[in-house]
Amino acid sequence: VNGEQTVPGSSFTADDCPAPTDPYAVSKFEAEQALLQLAAEGTMEVVIIRPPLVYGPGVKANFLSMMRWLNKGLPLPLGAIHNRRSLVGLPNLVDLLVCCLGHPAATNQVFLVSDGESLSTTELLRKLASALQRPARLLPVPQGWKLLWNHNFPHL
């Protein structure tokens, strides 16, 4: 809902103007607006929680793919990624949900939840490798080379 990126060195906040960029994000934003309208009419109370990537037992999608790559010991061209990404552990997300259920000040608020540390893809892979007790074989391939490769070989 917030968008795909922030100004380098900054993070998203609940006060940011939403900037959804794809149909899924637009639909989430429209649902939030509809719920907030119902809340404004006194029909119901709403708490909006916008989690980043959630990790924990049963994790799937990109996070699981990264774990599989590391478990296989594959060299990855991701050793020079300087992005920042927030994450939230499942227990922390559940704690926030429970807190919001019982706290009247949460009513009609928007919360961005995270573990409080933003990691680059490179840092995340190193931490995952350490937790998996596997080597992080990360090659520092410059971003320009990756863009050139993806442009010339989009199906690989």
List each language-model region with its residue ranges.
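Mid/C-terminal beta-alpha module of Rossmann-like enzyme folds, strongest
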Residues: 99, 103-156
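Substrate-positioning beta->alpha
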Residues: 30, 59-65, 79-102, 108-112
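Flexible, glycine-rich beta-alpha linker
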Residues: 2, 22, 44-65
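A short C-terminal helix-loop "cap" of Rossmann-like NAD(P)-dependent dehydrogenase/epimerase domains
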Residues: 17, 67-78, 134
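Short-chain dehydrogenase/reductase
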Residues: 10-13, 21-30, 53-56, 83-88, ...
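Active-site Tyr-X1-5-Lys
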Residues: 19-47
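Conserved catalytic-core motifs of eukaryotic protein kinase domains, centered on the activation segment
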Residues: 3-10, 59-61, 78
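Short glycine/proline- and charge-enriched loop/turn segments
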Residues: 9-18, 130, 153
